[in-house]
Amino acid sequence: MSDPLAAIARFPGVPEAVDEARQAVDRLYRHRVLRRASPAVSTESSLRGARASAAIEGVDVPLDVLRRDEAHDPLVQGALRASAEMGRLGATWRKAPRQVLARLHVVAAAGLTPQEELGRPRAFDEASDPLSLGPAPAAADTAARMEGLLGLLEQPTKAPAIVLAAVVHAELAVLRPFGTADGIVARSAERLTLVEYGLDPKSLVAVEVGHLELAYGDALRAYLSGTPEGVGAWVQHCAAAVSLGVRETTAICEAMQRG
């Protein structure tokens, strides 16, 4: 059986970027604060990740506003709900990814999408485009590519978790299978993949913060080119986002250590 993800993992620059990110995660997991406060660190990381994910979509809310539960924008609320839901979806992600994506959309797009469209693949060709990626693929083409993505998730691969997570993230972000809140769903699915495929089993890494700090839209446009160079650049971007997410979580640990 072919392993297209393993081929992507060998693109120039990808092995080195992935290895650097993995080493960063390994260093984070040795932080002494995590011996006693791992759940608290994960909770804070998830909050910062949700804030960053909403900011990428154009709604930037300060962390202290989120902590006081004073952010009422539906997109921000959707990002927070998706972040909270991930902990309940992990065991299902490998077995029923379609079900998980639908559930993520239900919680992420509530208040943005008519009730009857929540969790359902779009039947129309139009989709929101907050990153100015251009028109989304037609609904029929999107459905076909989604089947291919779900097939990738179901077959074994020798590719590192970062590569799988990067491809899942990019396909959801560029296909926009639901038409609204697809970016929130895409970044949630990436984080879920990093957790469930072993890179970050405690969900500590605020990878969304890394995406916000980097040239996220440009990296997705590189992926859209479909060339080995473009796809490789996207995976390297995702690896760099993991490393920056580790830096963010390390700062959380240091703050807790200081008390």
Task: List each model region and its residues.
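FIC/Doc superfamily catalytic core
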Residues: M1-G259
